[in-house]
């Protein structure tokens, strides 16, 4: 089985990378526009590459220490797995950003010809990042699994293979949390600081070249939404596939179906890469000029093709009949196929729900715009109300997904649903990475003084880009929540396995019964401790953005004060100073909060062990803390990302001209618009820093707990 399916899976991963290379050539061959556009894009490119180089250097230092620890505490193959996960995650983000900072001016230039041409370049740029994320993640896991089992000769379900693959997921997780948090602090420090002085104090429009923070804002779009999201979804993809393979190794140990069950998630991802590539060719602007409609055509085509891909993957690996029993439940290939379908349906519903809560001209966004008419305070109140309300429907969908898949295929069925969800990652990341390119294109059009019709086209693309970014975050959080649940299942089952084999693993000998009962005070304590982590983490992230934004406010005011010619247009702002200031702030502020979810499981386990003297109580508290992180993290992340997206598009409503309930039209520069800018400055760090960074924090706590078990077993 492995000998036939794995090479095909690897070939699918290679095709994804080949598609990305071919599309890169197509994007880079497009017209770059006039000299002024090239000059502005050059500033953005230099700033983004300088920031990312410094960020990766910082991560490399931390990563090197962790790799040495993995080698010492686990094994050489675990350390190599960690390095593979970290390096490939970094490469996906770096190459994606490398293309996006070159596609921005080409999109602006293409938009000067037609809206469709602008959409084509921006989407292709996003598709490059998307296919690299899916392709490199699949190649990393499948090739390393093949090497471990076929070249090094480890049995597929052995602890050596499981530990090495979990370490690969940990490598991706560590990059992800740093990239998400660091990129988020940079981008929102620039955005909020620049808006407060530029729009509110000086009364100049967004992306005005007189604002010294403008270039930093455009740099931030790339390092946050392109490189950051790429690392985030790479990690979710790799971690969820690995977790599902770990469950297969536990549930089907010693049965003939073991290898097929472990390869099944890889086969699903391989098939879905092909369907995602096919889906990209359906993104074309129709006669109604609906940009969202064009993007949805591609997403719907990918989803429909993925049903067939899922069927082929199921038939080629586990077949349609009975494959074994999980927790006394008979599992069939047909049931697992339906679990995959549930994953695709959950994805579709989360996309639709998130678009409803963040899309322009929808009730939630209109309610915030209407609240802006009566002032700043009412805007913030209504924005918070929408952010809280937006958690209900996604949570109900996720609950339905969990129960439905558990009834069909047990916890392994839930893992297959998450794998099918992440099979669509190539197309979903393409929709997300489309956002920063269109945002930058609008900035370049404004700064280069292009025709107002060009700015109108880029604004239309950017408004959709805001929604696609929010939709992608909803998808990333939903899949992360389900993925973390699969990781928790792996933790609980690993724990049972070690406890049942105490003679082989002496640390776990005679530890007694491990109970997750709520009557156990250590379980309740663990739940509460885990529950506080997303809030504390989010609070630290918001504080970091506030500090960075304050520094930018001071810097922009200083430049306006010391260079009066800037506002008159006779002096050039010092763009590099703001970029450098933010780079230092983001790198400095990202390290401590990033270590919080890494260290939390260790604090819980060893803290409870020290207090209670019972290993069973410590493991129960640790397991409960993982559930606390998953549940609270899910709600915190959804409320922040959807609420922030709604605030942003409420502000956009005024830029297009918002007609309130009394029929009065409010435009850019009006008092209502100023109130919406205040809401947007609150929503920005909500949706682009704290909310998205909670996502990898949820998974990293679960992975560290899994690795802790492996270390103790050694």
Swiss-Prot record:
Binding site for Mg(2+) 1: 191, 195
Annotated positions for site Determinant of potassium independence: 469
E.C. numbers: 7.1.3.1
Cofactor(s) listed: Mg(2+)
Signal peptide: 1-20
Superkingdom of origin: Bacteria
GO cellular component: acidocalcisome membrane; plasma membrane
Residues annotated for Mg(2+) 2 binding in this entry: 218, 221, 439
Spans through the membrane: 52-74, 85-105, 128-148, 166-186, 238-258, 263-283, 298-318, 333-353, 383-403, 411-431, 470-490, 522-542, 591-611, 618-638, 693-713
Presence of keyword Translocase: yes
GO molecular function: diphosphate hydrolysis-driven proton transmembrane transporter activity; inorganic diphosphate phosphatase activity; magnesium ion binding
Keyword GTP-binding assigned: no
Positions that bind substrate: 188, 687
One Pfam family linked to the record: H_PPase
Membrane association type: Multi-pass membrane protein
Catalytic activity: diphosphate + H2O + H(+)(in) = 2 phosphate + 2 H(+)(out)
Protein location: Acidocalcisome membrane
Job description of the protein: Proton pump that utilizes the energy of pyrophosphate hydrolysis as the driving force for proton movement across the membrane. Generates a proton motive force.
The protein's assembly and partners: Homodimer.
Name by which UniProt lists this protein: K(+)-insensitive pyrophosphate-energized proton pump
The organism of origin for this protein: Agrobacterium fabrum (strain C58 / ATCC 33970) (Agrobacterium tumefaciens (strain C58))
Annotated gene: hppA
